[in-house]
Amino acid sequence: MELKKTKNGTHYIDNVKFMDLIRITDNCCPICDCCRKDLIGYNDLILVPILNEVYCKECGKKELKQIKYYEEDREIEERRTSYYCDVLGIEE
């Protein structure tokens, strides 16, 4: 797993494993927040902290191209990103 940024500066976490997602959300049947596909068995998920959403790789690539950065959301994004990095063991 790796913390990354889009070209416009929005944080996202790449290559999240479905078991880690289950562990941090207590949701035993995670689905893509875009296409609603079952994510069991996927180890290349994309998590977007500011949205509290996770996507399959296909949808994640599309969503990251469309996502807009809002300066007024910076504090919220930083808190959520820190939270997810902490629970997933990712260095910021």
Show which residues each predicted segment covers:
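Short linker/helix segments within small regulatory modules
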Residues: 43-53
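Zinc-coordinating Cys/His ligand positions in small cysteine/histidine-rich zinc-finger domains
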Residues: 40, 55-57
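Glycine-centered loop/turn motifs
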Residues: 32, 42-43
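Short cysteine-rich clusters marking metal-coordination/redox-active sites
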Residues: 29-35, 48, 56
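Cys/His-coordinated Zn2+-binding motifs and related Cys/His-dense segments, i.e., zinc fingers/knuckles
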Residues: 33-38, 72-75
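A short, charged, amphipathic alpha-helix used as a generic interaction element across diverse proteins
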Residues: 60-64
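Short, non-ligating residues that shape and space the ligands of small metal-coordination modules
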Residues: 41-42, 65
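Short, intrinsically disordered terminal segments enriched in charged and Pro/Gly residues
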Residues: 1-28, 65-92
